[in-house]
Regions:
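Terminal export/targeting leaders at protein ends
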Residues: 1-204
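Anaerobic metallocofactor- and corrinoid-dependent redox/one-carbon enzyme cores
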Residues: 2-34, 216-224, 242-245, 262, ...
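Generic intrinsically disordered, low-complexity segments enriched for polar/acidic and small residues
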Residues: 53, 60, 71, 110, ...
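Transmembrane alpha-helical segments and their cytosolic interface motifs
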Residues: 180-257
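Membrane-engaging insertion elements
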Residues: 222-305
Length: 305
């Protein structure tokens, strides 16, 4: 399995608390809601695409209201404290005291995927491994959903053609060619070819993880691709501006739709069991979000952002 080419050799070691403190307050508030409020787990209801889209807008409005409420109560340190208290099950006044429990919470998240931590593995190394398995799990779920709804394939391919810009398609095509995942004879990347590549290339994660090393622009294009795929599966239509104004991966993944997507596929099966739900949320929401935020910062720095 390919890894994102990001240097993790840092001194002193990066902690989860450090990473959370690097995130902006709104992102922290959105993450806190994702981890603690199960009322946003349900998909938007409706018999038609219009009804589902309208109900999604109501969910989005309520979600943003909850974020605003939290931001009126907590500043950054308070948000980090609330997140770490939820993640570890311990309560401390000084957020630095949560660091002693970080390995245990990562070990618990790793166990969701059957991962056993290796000797001499840093916290960031373990985060990366969890993130890789999260990606693999996500693509496997995508395959399962398309097997249930094969008629969606053409709709998704069309949506990719319409929403990805020419520049984004060129960026993706170049990386796919460099990795030998599509023929060098192809001059124009179509939505169908992109979707087939994501579904069939190795474990399904090689494309996703490998593209991350190609730069921030490609990373955003990739995220838009995944988001578009699942939006179509849910039968929701979003304004084109949602994708043209996206400036970072987390702006797509942490919003209410991202919350719904990942919860439906990954967390709902564990809702009836409180301990399993907590483990599922650590493995599919908490750790991947923190690592994605870290990746984004590294990629932005690499492009002089």
């Amino acid at each position: 399995m390919e890894n994102l080419e990001i240097n993790t050799n840092t001194t002193p070691p990066i902690t989860i608390v450090d990473q959370l403190l690097e995130m902006d307050e709104r992102t922290l508030a959105e993450l806190l809601i994702r981890c603690t409020q199960t009322k946003f787990l349900k998909p938007p209801k409706g018999k038609t695409e219009e009804e589902r889209t309208e109900n999604y807008k109501k969910i989005e409005a309520e979600f943003n209201q909850e974020v605003d409420k939290i931001l009126q109560i907590y500043k950054k340190h308070g948000l980090v404290k609330e997140l770490m208290e939820w993640a570890t099950g311990f309560t401390y006044d000084d957020i630095s005291h949560y660091v002693q429990h970080e390995y245990d919470l990562l070990k618990r998240a790793a166990g969701f995927y059957g991962i056993k931590p290796r000797a001499m593995e840093t916290l960031l190394d373990l985060e990366r491994v969890i993130f890789e398995h999260w990606m693999q799990y996500l693509i496997e779920k995508l395959r399962e959903e398309l097997e249930k709804h094969p008629d969606k394939f053409d709709e998704i391919a069309k949506s990719l053609d319409e929403h990805l810009t020419s520049e984004e398609k060129e960026q993706l095509l170049k990386v796919l060619k460099d990795k030998g995942l599509v023929s060098k004879e192809i001059s124009n990347l179509q939505g169908r070819a992109l979707l087939e590549t994501i579904l069939t290339a190795g474990s399904g994660t090689g494309v996703l993880l490998g593209l991350g090393s190609a730069g921030f622009g490609v990373y955003i294009a990739l995220t838009k691709t995944i988001h578009l795929i699942f939006t179509q599966l849910l039968g929701i239509t979003l304004p084109f501006a949602v994708y043209t104004t996206a400036t970072k991966t987390l702006s797509l993944l942490l919003g209410p739709l991202g919350w719904i997507i990942f919860s439906i596929l990954m967390v709902i099966p564990f809702i009836q069991h409180a301990r399993k739900k907590k483990t599922a949320l650590l493995a599919t929401v908490f750790v991947p979000t923190i690592y994605l935020a870290y990746i984004e910062k590294q990629l932005q720095k690499g492009e002089g952002a």
